[in-house]
């Protein structure tokens, strides 16, 4: 599949995931009968319940990573339907010459666990192979990445419970774009071509984001979401401090994705050959992600929120019995998280590492379009907001061309 289709898949998947999770977090009442409703645990505000839904959504997000392995194997079988002729010839040549070679030492550590060993080795030798220095190093790497993802995803879900989906997407993707671009340059992962020109284009993109965020309050006021105090002339926003807190939490939590991106490329992408079968690489990296998900769930288990009252347990049970909750959750996983993660893994192999930062700019643009499509009567567009989107789109197109040069760089 081309990098363009993978790019759209990752961006649209992120938008679907964010909109679905925001729909769950913003739900204030649950229908319990023909005419009856009950407040959600988040609305009740009992001690221990204010973050219970955020915690469970984070836990379920890590659980969805277990589906990456079967999804990648399904993609491996369906891949001949989508690859181009050049990709097919390159992969067939590799299969004939190097089908048995594996260059990733960390995957070799668990190769006898993930696949059937050929030939089979005695149980004692297999046990000694599992308990080795390489195994502990591999588990330590996965644990570090799992801890980073726990912080990033908890802050992401917490921000969605406080702020609208667009505000969260704007803050998170801006922070990730800036920190990843900075660390890729400092750590020598990104290329040194056209550095000053790319810097000017990135500054233009950041200015466009600034204009969009600055005019957002004006758009909300014209749409009736905000009002003006007639006595003071100031905007009256009852959720102002929640929005500010959500933006701060999301922005700071997203910064940790910079070290995650650097460590992932150092540990699991540096040894990938451009001639290695992409389907095999995808299965290996999906296995890494699934193991990170398992470790993340294990770390989260001791911190399961406790409900202080019987009413809290009943409201949680009713919430999970609500069909819209499961439809939104399954939609965020099947049409959001899985396609986005698989596309990001493929893009990270096919294109230069810094090319992935364009997905963050695209997510902001498509999130704005999704808000306009889903809420046309509550969305008002002003001239300066359009100018901001134009600046951001032009920067995205130029960066996609300049950063996307040199495919199959690994």
Swiss-Prot record:
Single GO cellular component annotation? endoplasmic reticulum membrane
Question: Which residue ranges traverse the bilayer?
Answer: 51-71, 142-161, 168-187, 198-217, 246-265, 286-305, 325-344, 356-374, 386-404
Cytoplasmic-side positions? 72-141, 188-197, 266-285, 345-355, 405-410
Q: Where in the cell is it found?
A: Endoplasmic reticulum membrane
> What GO biological process, any one, is recorded here?
intracellular calcium ion homeostasis
Pfam families from the UniProt entry: CSG2 (PF16965)
Q: Which residues lie on this side of the membrane: Lumenal?
A: 18-50, 162-167, 218-245, 306-324, 375-385
Name the Gene Ontology molecular function terms of this record: enzyme regulator activity; intracellularly gated calcium channel activity
Question: Looking at the record's lineage, which domain of life comes first?
Answer: Eukaryota
Task: For this UniProt record, give its keywords in alphabetical order, as a comma-separated list.
Answer: Endoplasmic reticulum, Glycoprotein, Membrane, Signal, Transmembrane, Transmembrane helix
Report the membrane topology from the UniProt record.
Answer: Multi-pass membrane protein
Residues with glycosylation annotation: 35, 49
Cite the InterPro entries for this sequence: Csg2, EF_Hand_1_Ca_BS
Q: How does this chain assemble?
A: Heterodimer of CSH1 and CSG2, and SUR1 and CSG2.
Task: State the function annotated in the UniProt record.
Answer: Required for calcium regulation. May regulate calcium accumulation by a non-vacuole organelle. Also regulates the activity of CSH1 and SUR1 during mannosyl phosphorylinositol ceramide synthesis.
Q: What is this protein called?
A: Mannosyl phosphorylinositol ceramide synthase regulatory protein CSG2
The species this protein was found in: Saccharomyces cerevisiae (strain ATCC 204508 / S288c) (Baker's yeast)
Gene for this chain? CSG2
């Amino acid at each position: 599949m081309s990098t363009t289709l993978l790019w759209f898949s990752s961006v649209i998947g992120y938008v679907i995931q964010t909109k679905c999770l925001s729909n769950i977090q913003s739900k204030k009442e649950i229908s319990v009968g023909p005419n009856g409703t009950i407040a959600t645990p988040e609305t009740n505000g009992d001690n221990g319940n204010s973050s219970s839904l955020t915690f469970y959504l984070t836990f379920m997000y890590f659980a969805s990573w277990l589906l990456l392995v079967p999804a990648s194997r399904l993609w491996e079988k369906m891949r001949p339907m989508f690859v181009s002729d050049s990709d097919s010839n390159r992969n067939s040549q590799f299969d004939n010459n190097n089908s048995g070679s594996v260059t990733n030492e960390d995957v070799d550590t668990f190769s006898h666990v993930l696949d059937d060993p050929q030939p089979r080795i005695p149980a004692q030798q297999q046990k000694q192979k599992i308990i080795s220095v390489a195994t502990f190093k591999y588990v330590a790497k996965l644990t570090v990445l799992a801890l980073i993802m726990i912080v990033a995803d908890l802050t992401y879900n917490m921000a969605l419970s406080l702020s609208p989906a667009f505000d969260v997407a704007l803050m998170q993707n801006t922070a990730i774009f800036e920190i990843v671009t900075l660390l890729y340059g400092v750590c020598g992962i990104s290329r040194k071509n056209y550095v000053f020109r790319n810097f000017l284009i990135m500054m233009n993109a950041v200015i466009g984001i600034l204009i969009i965020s600055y005019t957002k309050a004006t758009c909300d006021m014209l749409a009736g979401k905000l009002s003006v105090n007639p006595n003071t002339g100031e905007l009256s926003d009852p959720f102002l401090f929640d929005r500010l807190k959500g933006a701060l939490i999301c922005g700071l939590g997203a910064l940790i994705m910079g070290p995650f991106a650097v460590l992932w490329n150092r540990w699991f992408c540096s040894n990938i050959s451009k001639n290695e079968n992409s389907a095999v690489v995808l299965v290996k990296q999906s296995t890494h992600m699934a193991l990170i998900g398992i470790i993340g769930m294990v770390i989260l288990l001791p911190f399961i929120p406790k409900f202080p009252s019987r009413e809290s347990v009943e409201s949680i049970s009713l919430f999970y019995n609500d069909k819209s909750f499961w439809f939104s959750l399954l939609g965020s996983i099947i049409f959001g998280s899985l396609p986005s993660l698989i596309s990001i893994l493929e893009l990270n192999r096919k294109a230069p590492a810094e090319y992935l930062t364009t997905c963050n700019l695209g997510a902001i643009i498509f999130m704005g379009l999704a808000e306009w499509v889903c809420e046309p009567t509550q969305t008002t567009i002003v001239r300066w907001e359009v100018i901001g989107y134009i600046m951001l789109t032009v920067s995205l197109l130029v960066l996609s061309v300049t950063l996307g040069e040199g495919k199959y760089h690994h």
